[in-house]
Design a protein with these regions (language model features):
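Active-site "cap" helix and flanking loop/linker of ATP-utilizing ligase/carboxylase catalytic domains
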Residues: 203-254, 285-309
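Active-site nucleotide/adenylate-binding loops and adjacent lid/helix of ATP-dependent enzymes
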Residues: 1-6, 91-179, 183-184
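Zn-dependent metallopeptidase/amidohydrolase metal-coordination segment
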Residues: 278-282
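Hydrophobic beta-strand scaffold residues
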Residues: 35, 80-81, 109, 140, ...
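Phosphate-binding site of ATP-dependent enzymes
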Residues: 157-239, 262-267
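Conserved metal-phosphate-binding beta-hairpin within the catalytic cores
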Residues: 180, 191, 246-277, 287
């Protein structure tokens, strides 16, 4: 099969995309496919037409490749592509929309509010905080509504003293989500397959205050370990990850992130429709423990590639 491998782009997650593409390229070669590298830029429609491929393997992360825009283009061009479709990708990218859906499905989320990037940078977010349901909480997390890899994610230890005025923000997200900080362990659950199944989970223990961009992509930034918790709560998180996958309308692959408290209550942090896919990323690590090889996931995604979904 002639496969167009799309990666890169002028986004905060360009380097992550290229790292994923490197591993995927090796897997495609092992599987015997013909590979055409397609680096994302403003002329992407022409690059895709010129490549004359049977299918697009989407190795993009973040804006354009993960938020439904590349998917919409490929739907119009009627070229099959991997991962989720246009609408599901757009929904999964927007943390606030996801939270609204989760609440409607009675899946626990962390309390918070949204604020524009402009209000954030001018410290007007404090007015919104004082009028929010978390006005009595001073320890908060702030993250872009539409971005990934913990880009521009901040731990606010004291909301009364914290200022964004001197902080340079790199995200293109127009809005931010500010939530109360709940102490707990971060649990990652992998969902794979056309008939979605939660294949396993792991706990992430960052070496810093939280699982930020540096912890995710630096050597020794975090430790991955088995989840030590009661069987009932582990089973509940696995079931909830599949429920989230189906609720958003995701396809073939997703990673749900949960916060597990010492009382074994869990909250969904977010869902990722296009999880990192280097050889050492979380999804391949969980899959390997379940006896699923990296190349098998790549082949499954190619086999299930489609457009218009």
């Amino acid at each position: 099969m002639r496969v167009g491998l799309v990666f890169g782009g002028n986004t905060t997650e360009c380097d992550v995309s290229k790292s994923s593409a490197s591993g995927i390229r090796g897997a495609l070669q092992k599987l015997g496919h013909e590979i055409v590298d397609i680096e994302f830029d403003k002329d992407i429609p022409l690059h895709i037409l010129d490549a004359n491929v049977d299918v697009i393997y989407n190795s993009m992360h973040g804006q354009y490749g993960e938020d439904g825009r590349l998917q919409g283009l490929l739907d119009i061009m009627q070229i099959p592509y991997t991962h989720s479709g246009c609408l599901a990708s757009a929904l999964a990218m927007n943390k606030q929309l996801c939270n609204n859906l989760f609440k409607g499905a009675r899946i626990k989320t962390i309390k918070g509010f949204t604020v524009s990037k402009e209000r954030l940078q001018n410290d007007l977010w404090k007015e919104d905080w004082k009028n929010s349901e978390i006005a009595n909480k001073t320890e908060l997390f702030c993250k872009p509504v539409c971005d990934g890899s913990s880009v521009d994610t901040f731990l606010i230890e004291n909301a009364n003293e914290f200022s964004f005025k001197e902080i340079t923000l790199h995200t293109k997200s127009k809005d931010f989500l500010i939530e109360e900080r709940i102490h707990g362990r971060e649990i990652q659950v992998a969902v794979l397959g056309r008939e979605p199944e939660a294949v396993g989970m792991l706990e992430v223990k960052p070496n810093g205050e939280f699982y930020d961009y540096k912890a995710k992509y630096s050597e020794n930034g975090a430790i991955h370990c088995d989840v030590e918790a009661g069987e009932e709560v582990k089973h509940a998180m696995l079931e909830t990850a599949v429920k989230i996958h189906n609720l958003i309308g995701l396809k073939d692959i997703s990673r749900s992130e949960f916060l597990l408290t010492k009382d074994e209550e869990f909250y969904v942090l977010e869902v990722n429709s296009h999880p990192g896919f280097t050889q050492t990323s979380i999804i391949p690590e969980i899959a390997a423990k379940a006896g699923i090889k990296y190349e098998e996931i790549v082949e499954m995604l190619l086999k299930n590639a489609s457009y218009g979904g």
